[in-house]
Amino acid sequence: MCGAVRYTITAPVEYVGYCHCSSCRQSSGSAFALFAGVKKVYLQITQGAVSMGNYVRNADTMAHFCRECSSVLFVAVRKGEYAHVQMGTLLKVPGIWPQSSIPKAVWADDITNGQPQFTEFPDWC
């Protein structure tokens, strides 16, 4: 986010999803985090590794963040073999739609609740 840490993904993203767990909600400041799943060996830190920190979220996940701006960059999951890269940190968005919500929030079946959707910001926004 601040640019202190940079990385590249050297293989196609395998999946995209929403996570509604309390850790992802808190670290994203939103109702969910949108992530891109990739094998961790294909996530290469190209700049600023010394600016990275990490912390254990639970027995199965470790979050990696930027020490300069505190942005969560990715979360190591599935015994550290995969990285859930925060989509908001990517310069190029993968061309695949989210396939799942984990753990699914009660309201996730209809996130818009019938509200209109816009391709551009309306004048009143």
Predicted regions and their residues:
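A short Gly-Trp-Pro
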Residues: 4-125
